Amino acid sequence: VNNPNQLARVKSFFEDVPSHAKITTGGKQVSRDGFFIEPTVIADLKQGDRHIQEEIFGPVITVQKFKDEAEAIKLANGVVYGLASSVWTSNHSRAMRLAKAFDFGCVWINCHIPVVAEMPHGGYKRSGYGKDLSAYGFEDYTRIKHVMTNLGA
């Protein structure tokens, strides 16, 4: 992470894991020199948990179980933020259906955070306004106007 305040914030998510959930890997600061945190997976979270409802902005993936695609969509979209999500499945058709239904600015399939300059990056809902990266990022800095004249008049 990029500063001591964010380090403390991310670590607070590790200290606040509910009893029904568990850190399956990671969850520790790598060293006291710098602001490095192990890549972390927190599993068995519930919809109301802080880890699901807030943006962590650290090397953390949260995992929820679901019964069917309808429930997966309801859980994923049942948050006020919408920056990014990921779908993990061996069924590509399912992944595409879920990606289309998820209300997030970025949906990654079988990966997480592969940000590239050629693709727009930015969220929906309370996760920011507009896009950065790619040609779409320029639209936030432009004001389009249509002007037409009849030169024969």
Predicted features and spans:
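Helical element adjacent to the flavin cofactor pocket in flavoenzyme catalytic cores
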Residues: S12-H20
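Conserved C-terminal structural/oligomerization subdomain of aldehyde/semialdehyde dehydrogenase
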Residues: Q29, F36-A153
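Short secondary-structure junctions
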Residues: H20-G27
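Short beta-strand to alpha-helix junction loop
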Residues: V1-K11
